[in-house]
Amino acid sequence: MMHIDEILEYLPHRYPFLLVDRVTEVEKGKSIKGYKNVSFNEPFFTGHFPDNPIMPGVLIIEAMAQLSGILGFVTVERKPSDGVVQYLAGSSKARFKRPVLPGDRLDMESEFISGKRGIWKFDCRALVDGEVVCVAEILTAEREV
């Protein structure tokens, strides 16, 4: 398990763009699980949508990419403090099954599919109360900064 202090060592993101609150499981080179508590106070709810707030799908993809980036860093035993970052390089096969609402806990899972020359491919899904809300394949790219 990784608490927020350790997550901050693996992700360069900060408020309001840090979208992983806790890592619950990580198996180096294989898979990772974590979650984001979706609060009504999230800045994106101000405009998406004022009378019917839902978490933007692109931010669900970003949250899964951040979780996948942690798995990538853990696997290669590097951190941003080593002068590298994991960028979201692409997504495919994204499907949104139902909206994510204020008060939901967005549980996320990512499995490593393949990697070559610093490009990593992950099979991801996000759930709320055990129900799948989003699936996607995510690509991250490790780059020196």
From Swiss-Prot:
Q: Name one Pfam family in it.
A: FabA
Indicate whether Lipid metabolism appears among the record's keywords: yes
Q: Which InterPro entries match?
A: FabA_FabZ, FabZ, HotDog_dom_sf
Query: Catalysed reaction per UniProt?
Result: a (3R)-hydroxyacyl-[ACP] = a (2E)-enoyl-[ACP] + H2O
Q: What is its main location?
A: cytoplasm
The active site is formed by 48
Q: Name one GO cellular component term.
A: cytoplasm
Keywords (A to Z) from UniProt:
Cytoplasm, Lipid A biosynthesis, Lipid biosynthesis, Lipid metabolism, Lyase
What Gene Ontology terms for biological process does this UniProt record contain? fatty acid biosynthetic process; lipid A biosynthetic process
Which of the seven top EC classes does this enzyme belong to?
A: lyase
Where in or outside the cell?
Answer: Cytoplasm
Q: Does the keyword Cell cycle apply?
A: no
- Highest taxon of the lineage: Bacteria
Q: Name one GO molecular function term.
A: (3R)-hydroxyacyl-[acyl-carrier-protein] dehydratase activity
Q: Tell me its EC number(s), please.
A: 4.2.1.59
For this protein, the record's PANTHER family field holds: 3-HYDROXYACYL-[ACYL-CARRIER-PROTEIN] DEHYDRATASE (PTHR30272:SF1)
What family does this belong to?
Answer: Belongs to the thioester dehydratase family. FabZ subfamily.
The UniProt function text for this chain reads: Involved in unsaturated fatty acids biosynthesis. Catalyzes the dehydration of short chain beta-hydroxyacyl-ACPs and long chain saturated and unsaturated beta-hydroxyacyl-ACPs.
Query: By what name is this protein known?
Result: 3-hydroxyacyl-[acyl-carrier-protein] dehydratase FabZ
Per the UniProt record, the source organism is: Marinobacter nauticus (strain ATCC 700491 / DSM 11845 / VT8) (Marinobacter aquaeolei)
